[in-house]
């Protein structure tokens, strides 16, 4: 069998990421034009800052091509910050007026609730990669604790013994998370599929459109791997899609938003020089030469699903922010939970999702995720 040749190398990605934003805009515009020539497409818009950039920039390019309308799909999972959910329609109206282009916004909803996903599959913890590893490793363990041979490579990764093709320990080994395998917490990567991707697939099948997404290689190893294999316009995949912002960085997204004077959802706060957040301004910030400053948001650095624990090691204060910004939702997330009689595994109850126990297990194993009023949620384990 002939081994597939990657579209790009890691060195090419690093070079692209170093390009100035103006050049990145030109490259992204060319990919959007290529997409427009070959496919009917929609822009996936969560209400987050990166997908807002995708909506704004794509509308600008389509307007320059003489297009009269642009299709936008929002998957309303019900899991985003309320300010993000409300922002979707308002921002589409803003872009439509800004570029004098019709924005046809459609909202889709998941068939399966988040609570049901957790009960049937498990909690999303650490990352998709780690959660999938835990989920599948458990399928390889018999009720008596012996291994049945299924997904043995997942078990090896959790033991830290998996070797790569060169006979070296794999970079994908994750023994630091084996405690999750040994815990009574069900863990799974399937939530995104059930809550986000399945509704998108239904829309795509009905309309014949393919998605333009705002994901970047900087966000995760899986997204970097996908770009290395297929490039921005992955037209030859089983599910064709375009990710024309793949080589943009978080700083690029922030600078574009600032330069365009775009509104952002309230959960982010505002965009400001990072030095100002530390109580001091550098020379460029004082002169308001913002293109030379490192920017940040004064609120959430990222939004996404507020109940999701993917990326929690990079953003450990996520639950604290939720407690401050939306205390009633935070209370439901933390409260409740019990051990199932059938197998002793932890699951949500009608009182809440039971995250207090999940966070306690993480904290006990060196992954510090603070939350307030812990004593109010804890029960006898």
Q: Residues of each region from the PLM?
A:
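ATP-dependent adenylation/nucleotidyltransferase module used to activate substrates
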Residues: 2-252
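ATP/NTP-dependent adenylation/nucleotidyl-transfer catalytic domains that generate, transfer
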Residues: 2-14, 237-238, 250-381
């Amino acid at each position: 069998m002939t081994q597939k040749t990657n579209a790009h190398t890691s060195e090419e990605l690093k070079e692209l990421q170093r390009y100035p934003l103006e050049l990145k805009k030109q490259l992204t515009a060319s990919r959007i034009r290529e997409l427009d020539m070959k496919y009917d497409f929609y822009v996936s818009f969560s209400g987050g800052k990166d997908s807002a950039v995708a909506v704004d920039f794509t509308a600008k390019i389509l307007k320059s091509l003489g297009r009269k309308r642009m299709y936008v799909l929002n998957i309303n999972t019900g899991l985003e910050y309320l300010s993000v959910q409300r922002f979707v329609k308002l921002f589409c109206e803003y872009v439509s007026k800004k570029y004098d282009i019709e924005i046809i916004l459609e909202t889709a909803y998941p068939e399966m609730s988040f609570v049901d996903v957790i009960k049937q599959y498990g909690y999303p913890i650490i990352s998709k990669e780690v959660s999938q590893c835990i989920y599948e490793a458990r399928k390889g363990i018999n009720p008596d604790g012996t291994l049945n041979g299924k997904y043995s490579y997942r078990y090896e990764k959790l033991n830290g013994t998996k070797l790569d093709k060169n006979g070296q320990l794999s970079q994908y080994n994750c023994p630091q998370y084996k405690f999750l395998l040994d815990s009574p917490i069900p863990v799974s990567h399937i939530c995104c599929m059930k809550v986000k991707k399945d509704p998108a697939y239904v829309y795509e099948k009905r309309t014949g459109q393919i998605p333009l997404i705002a994901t970047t290689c900087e966000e995760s190893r899986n997204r970097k791997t996908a770009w290395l294999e297929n490039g921005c316009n992955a037209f030859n995949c089983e599910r064709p899609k375009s990710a024309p912002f793949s080589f943009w960085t978080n700083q690029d997204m922030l600078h574009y938003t600032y330069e365009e004077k775009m509104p952002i959802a309230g959960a982010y706060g505002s965009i400001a020089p990072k030095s100002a957040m530390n109580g001091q301004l550098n020379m460029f910030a004082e002169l308001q030469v913002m293109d030379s400053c490192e920017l940040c948001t004064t609120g959430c650095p990222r939004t996404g699903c507020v109940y999701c624990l993917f990326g929690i090691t990079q953003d450990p204060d996520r639950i604290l922010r939720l407690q401050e910004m939306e205390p009633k939702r935070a209370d439901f997330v933390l409260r409740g939970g019990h051990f199932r009689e059938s197998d002793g595994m932890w699951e949500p109850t009608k009182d809440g999702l039971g995250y207090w126990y999940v966070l306690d297990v993480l904290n006990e194993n060196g992954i510090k995720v603070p939350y307030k009023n812990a004593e109010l949620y804890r029960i006898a384990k």
